[in-house]
Structures are given as C-alpha cells and as structure tokens.
C-alpha cells in the first residue's frame, strides 16, 4: 500500500469517528433536554418517558458504534490496499 492511500485511510478513520460521534452526541443532548422538560411538566409520566428515552439513546449510540466499526475497518482491514 502506498503512503497516500495509507494517509487517506487514517484521515478517513478519524473523520468517521469524529463525525460519527457529533450527531449522536447532539441528538442525545436534545433528547435528554426534552425528557427533562416532559418529566417536569408531567411527573406522573416519568416511567414512560424514561423508557422511551433509554431506547432512543440505544439507537443513537448505535450510530457512534457504526462509525467506530468503519474506522477500525479502514485502519486494520483496509479494503483499498
């Protein structure tokens, strides 16, 4: 593998992890804000809101894990070599 392909793979892996973490991070912050506001308005619905929040956190976190998997593939099982 030549040096340009190797360097591009490292940069792409960094971008995959970085950009893959920004979106879910912002989404989790917005979801938590909405959940806290919802619980403050309707304390009796806390259990339902919390369950939905945790499920949505799991879906958002899976996007970050997909970015990590792409980065690991680019670094260790490079398809471009």
UniProtKB/Swiss-Prot annotation:
It is a multi-pass membrane protein. Keywords: ATP synthesis, CF(0), Hydrogen ion transport, Ion transport, Lipid-binding, Membrane, Thylakoid, Transmembrane, Transmembrane helix, Transport. InterPro entries: ATP_synth_csu_bac/chlpt, ATP_synth_F0_csu, ATP_synth_F0_csu_DDCD_BS, ATP_synth_F0_csu_sf, ATPase_proteolipid_c-like_dom, F/V-ATP_Csub_sf. Its main location: membrane. GO terms for molecular function: lipid binding; proton-transporting ATP synthase activity, rotational mechanism. The record marks 61 as: Reversibly protonated during proton transport. One of its GO terms (cellular component) is proton-transporting ATP synthase complex. It is found in: Cellular thylakoid membrane. Disulfide bonds: none annotated. Pfam families: ATP-synt_C (PF00137). PROSITE patterns: ATPASE_C. The chain crosses the membrane at residues 7-27, 57-77. F(1)F(0) ATP synthase produces ATP from ADP in the presence of a proton or sodium gradient. F-type ATPases consist of two structural domains, F(1) containing the extramembraneous catalytic core and F(0) containing the membrane proton channel, linked together by a central stalk and a peripheral stalk. During catalysis, ATP synthesis in the catalytic domain of F(1) is coupled via a rotary mechanism of the central stalk subunits to proton translocation. Key component of the F(0) channel; it plays a direct role in translocation across the membrane. A homomeric c-ring of between 10-14 subunits forms the central stalk rotor element with the F(1) delta and epsilon subunits. Belongs to the ATPase C chain family. F-type ATPases have 2 components, F(1) - the catalytic core - and F(0) - the membrane proton channel. F(1) has five subunits: alpha(3), beta(3), gamma(1), delta(1), epsilon(1). F(0) has four main subunits: a(1), b(1), b'(1) and c(10-14). The alpha and beta chains form an alternating ring which encloses part of the gamma chain. F(1) is attached to F(0) by a central stalk formed by the gamma and epsilon chains, while a peripheral stalk is formed by the delta, b and b' chains. This is ATP synthase subunit c. It comes from Prochlorococcus marinus (strain MIT 9301). The lineage of its organism: Bacteria, Bacillati, Cyanobacteriota, Cyanophyceae, Synechococcales.
